[in-house]
């Protein structure tokens, strides 16, 4: 996707925007918490980052944050929470052409549905 000006930076946000804003750091904080196995803290950081990216029009970063929230819920063994985030991220990942993440999200969504219905 492109911005109103038709230019995008490497983070999926409007070009010329400082990547070192609060939203950017919340995303990095979520990544750090994930790396340390602190998935609940990661979820909170990613959710806040997703809100910021959405308001900034950074569609790629927004979609990836939604997916990261789902990943964190799956790491906690909470497929019922991951389900909604996967469903929200899938159309965005598809639209943005993020095929690798879209494929992962589809697999995770199928796994969530399987776990929730008791069919393995």
State where each predicted segment sits:
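Single-residue signature of alpha-solenoid repeat helices
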Residues: 3-6, 42, 82
């Amino acid at each position: 996707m492109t911005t109103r000006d038709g230019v995008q930076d490497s983070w999926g946000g409007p070009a010329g925007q400082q990547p070192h804003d609060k939203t950017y750091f919340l995303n990095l904080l979520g990544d750090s918490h994930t790396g340390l196995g602190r998935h609940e803290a990661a979820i909170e950081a990613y959710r806040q980052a997703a809100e910021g990216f959405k308001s900034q029009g950074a569609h790629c970063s927004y979609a990836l944050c939604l997916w990261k929230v789902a990943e964190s819920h799956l790491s906690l063994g909470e497929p019922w929470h991951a389900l909604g985030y996967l469903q929200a991220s899938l159309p965005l990942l598809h639209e943005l052409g993020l095929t690798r993440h879209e494929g992962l999200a589809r697999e995770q969504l199928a796994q969530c549905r399987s776990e929730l219905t008791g069919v393995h």
